[in-house]
Design a protein with these regions (language model features):
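N-terminal Rossmann-like NAD(P) cofactor-binding subdomain of oxidoreductases
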Residues: 1-142
Length: 142
């Protein structure tokens, strides 16, 4: 499944590093409000809390970064609805920014995972508490 990761702060970097070697999920786009790809690469490779990332990313072409397992396009849109989503299956929004849920529901993706609580999400899920309530047929924004 192809993923767009929106935001690479503390949570976004942790998600990126967890999914970087996962063969079932591929982060193909990172959308980050920071317009400087060099800063994004540096913050992924040298995190002040998580430390150095062994499989370092580097800039390989204009707005693309790559390491030994992933090649990822970098965008810096201020809204998810402005991004070309034709090849994206899942959005993980770790930006912390509250998006308009009505707009998100119309995006052409299978699911949108918010890493922050939102009263208007289809379900606010906490592993170990209510994950059994998740129904992929009716819950798109999680």
């Amino acid at each position: 499944m192809k993923i767009l990761l929106n935001g690479v702060g503390r949570i976004g970097k942790a998600i990126l590093k967890q999914l970087d070697t996962n063969k079932d999920f591929e982060i193909v786009v990172i959308n980050e409000i920071n317009p400087y790809v060099e800063n994004i690469v540096y913050s992924i490779n040298y995190d002040s809390t998580y430390g150095k990332y062994e499989d370092k990313f580097k800039i390989v072409e204009n707005n693309y970064i790559q390491n030994s397992t992933s090649k990822i396009k970098i965008t810096n849109f201020d809204s998810l609805e402005k991004i070309d989503l034709k090849d994206i299956d899942i959005i993980i929004d770790s930006s912390g920014k509250k998006e308009d849920i009505k707009l998100l529901k119309n995006l052409p993706v299978i699911a949108i995972f918010l890493t922050h609580p939102n009263n208007e999400a289809d379900i606010n899920m906490i592993l170990g508490v209510n994950e059994k309530d998740l129904n992929p047929n009716i819950h798109k924004i999680i």
